[in-house]
């Protein structure tokens, strides 16, 4: 198995370098067919989302749709796809930043319902109670 870097996914999604995007499309077909496997680390997913939102100014719903498709590739391994998919929904629905959406998703998956934080945006997440120390 190999690891996939952020620039691979970004080249495909943005098509800003068509020659590279075509090569990535071939790799993604192999991941779809499971003739190739790859691992996508959590931090690389965060990097992809940060670049798509910050540099490419893509709407959150578009980012969610793209990343849901990528994470659904049978040959692509991710530490916990369900946590990531839930985090993508939280990211879109609450408009909080990705790292906090991912944290909230991990909390909910682990049955943790309280967070020590001064960030009021955690108040938007159903099932989580924010506590200020």
Label the predicted regions.
Residues 1, 104-105, 109-133:
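Acidic, PIN/NYN-like endoribonuclease modules and their adjacent C-terminal/linker elements
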Residues 1-40, 55-62, 68:
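Short, well-structured N-terminal submotif of metal-dependent ribonuclease cores
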Residues 5, 40-41, 96-97, 119, ...:
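Histidine- and aromatic-rich ligand-binding microenvironments
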Residues 34-35, 73, 94, 125:
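Structured helix-beta-strand junction loops
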Residues 75-115:
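Active-site neighborhoods of divalent-metal-dependent phosphate/nucleic-acid chemistry enzymes
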């Amino acid at each position: 198995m190999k690891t996939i870097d952020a620039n691979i996914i970004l080249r495909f999604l943005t098509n800003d370098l068509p020659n590279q995007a075509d090569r990535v499309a071939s790799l993604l077909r192999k991941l779809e067919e499971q003739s190739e496997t790859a691992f996508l680390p959590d931090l690389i997913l965060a990097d992809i989302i940060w670049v798509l939102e910050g540099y490419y100014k893509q709407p959150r719903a578009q980012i969610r749709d793209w990343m849901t498709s990528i994470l659904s590739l049978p040959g692509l391994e991710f530490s916990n796809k369900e946590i990531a998919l839930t985090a993508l929904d939280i990211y879109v629905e609450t408009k909080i930043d990705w790292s906090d959406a991912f944290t909230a998703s991990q909390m909910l998956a682990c049955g943790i319902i309280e967070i020590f934080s001064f960030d009021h945006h955690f108040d938007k997440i159903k099932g989580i109670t924010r506590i200020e120390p």
